[in-house]
Amino acid sequence: MRTFTWRKGSLSKVNTCYVLAGGKSKRFGEDKLLYEIKGKKVIERVYETAKSVFKEVYIVAKDREKFSFLNAPVVLDEFEESASIIGLYTALKHAKEENVFVLSGDLPLMKKETVLYVLENFKEPVSVAKTEKLHTLVGVYSKKLLEKIEERIKKGDYRIWALLKDVGYNEVEIPEELRYTLLNMNTKEDLKRILAIENHY
């Protein structure tokens, strides 16, 4: 594993993380965020990783009680629809600072090193992780995007990638040795892969 260093410039700009936890887990067949891997719920693993980097970490969700076991501050989604862009909008609207880190709640293999790598390569207004695909829910977003996001939500356009194409963004190419940390747990097949990787590391 390579060694990562913190750049003061990046960290001074990004002190807050929002973990998005408002999805329905339809493809997984049960609530994936509450699924336990080695004695810890998926959302718990992601939250602890975020806490190891940021001064403030919030959970963005539709149900405050559901995540009470984390003893973490919960921000309730601004809209009823279950879409990632709703969580993003809620996070940016709640944010006190200009830039915040956004992290999907279904990344049980996420590591501090991956988060730091994205931070080190942060450029405004948006920087998101990239492997063979773009990971729009692992990155830094600016509050300046609020108006454009709201416009898209009102039109029923929930595509984050379309938003990024519109506003411009920076792709942070994740090193090969950290790419496994970006594996989403959407299905039971994903879970099998995640458990195999977890046992390997």
Swiss-Prot record:
One of its GO terms (cellular component) is cytoplasm. Mg(2+) binds at residue 106. Keywords: Cytoplasm, GTP-binding, Magnesium, Metal-binding, Molybdenum cofactor biosynthesis, Nucleotide-binding, Transferase. GO terms for molecular function: GTP binding; metal ion binding; molybdenum cofactor guanylyltransferase activity; nucleotidyltransferase activity. InterPro entries: MobA-like_NTP_Trfase, Molybde_CF_guanTrfase, Nucleotide-diphossugar_trans. Pfam families: NTP_transf_3. Its main location: cytoplasm. It comes from the Bacteria. It catalyses: Mo-molybdopterin + GTP + H(+) = Mo-molybdopterin guanine dinucleotide + diphosphate. Its cofactor is Mg(2+). GO terms for biological process: Mo-molybdopterin cofactor biosynthetic process. The keyword Repressor does not apply. It is found in: Cytoplasm. Its EC number is 2.7.7.77. Gene3D superfamilies: Spore Coat Polysaccharide Biosynthesis Protein SpsA, Chain A. It is an enzyme of class 2 (transferase). The N-terminal domain determines nucleotide recognition and specific binding, while the C-terminal domain determines the specific binding to the target protein. PANTHER family: MOLYBDENUM COFACTOR GUANYLYLTRANSFERASE. HAMAP family: MobA (MF_00316). NCBIfam families: PRK00317.1-3. Belongs to the MobA family. Transfers a GMP moiety from GTP to Mo-molybdopterin (Mo-MPT) cofactor (Moco or molybdenum cofactor) to form Mo-molybdopterin guanine dinucleotide (Mo-MGD) cofactor. This is Probable molybdenum cofactor guanylyltransferase. The gene is mobA.
